[in-house]
Design a protein with these regions (language model features):
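Extended interaction regions within the primary functional domain
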Residues: 1-2, 20, 116
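Hydrophobic alpha-helical segments, especially transmembrane helices
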Residues: 9-11, 31
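Bacterial N-terminal signal peptides
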Residues: 14-26
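Short hydrophobic "helix-edge" motifs at membrane interfaces and signal-peptide entry regions
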Residues: 10, 16-17, 77
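N-terminal start-of-domain structural block
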Residues: 2, 29-30
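Long, charged/polar, soluble alpha-helical segments
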Residues: 31-176
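N-terminal secretory signal peptides that target proteins for export/translocation
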Residues: 1-9
Length: 176
């Protein structure tokens, strides 16, 4: 009987030690959980939708096309602002990609059109619109969470660069 009591005590001691070891190891394993840092949202897809492209191609001259480009871009920017207020950041990013494509296309079209009659005024109109849009993009960036703010920061820089490009074309000798 003495032997069986000794065996039971050892078994109890061994099981208590195993239990204590498993508790201490589980907390160490939990501390090693992989912490994934938040990832930035992917950049927006920069494209002009088919219906907008059709409208732009049907414009009768550079002045009408520039006005239409600015109206379409203004619409997309306003929609992106509304979606940002509603915390729908993916949809806002998509609209900002279309906005970016429209503004880049408007400038490139004027450059391709060359120095026709009123292109200087059209470059000035684009520059003035971009000046207003830069403040609105910055306002959206301030209310956007960090994962999407990088895209808005890049768009703000692009808007400033496009504005500079429009100003340089405005003062270029070849544009009249």
């Amino acid at each position: 009987m003495n032997r069986s009591n000794l065996y039971r005590k050892r078994l109890m001691l061994l099981s208590a030690l195993m239990f204590a070891a498993s508790l201490s190891l589980s907390s160490g394993a939990r501390a090693q959980d992989l912490v994934v840092p938040p990832q930035a949202a992917p950049p927006p897809m920069v494209y002009i939708p088919k219906e907008a492209r059709t409208q732009l191609l049907s414009a009768r001259d550079e002045k009408a096309r520039t006005r239409l480009s600015l109206e379409l871009a203004e619409t997309r920017l306003a929609r992106a602002e509304q979606q940002t207020e509603l915390k729908q950041f993916n949809a806002a990013t998509a609209d900002l990609g279309v906005y970016q494509a429209l503004m880049e296309d408007a400038l490139q079209h004027l450059y391709r059109a060359g120095g026709t009659g009123g292109s200087r005024d059209l470059f000035k109109r684009i520059e003035q619109s971009l000046h207003k849009h830069a403040a609105r993009v910055e306002g959206m960036r301030r209310t956007t969470p960090g994962e999407f703010a990088g895209n808005l920061r890049a768009l703000g820089k692009l808007v400033r660069d496009l504005r500079t490009e429009a100003l340089e074309a405005f003062y270029d000798d070849s544009i009249m």
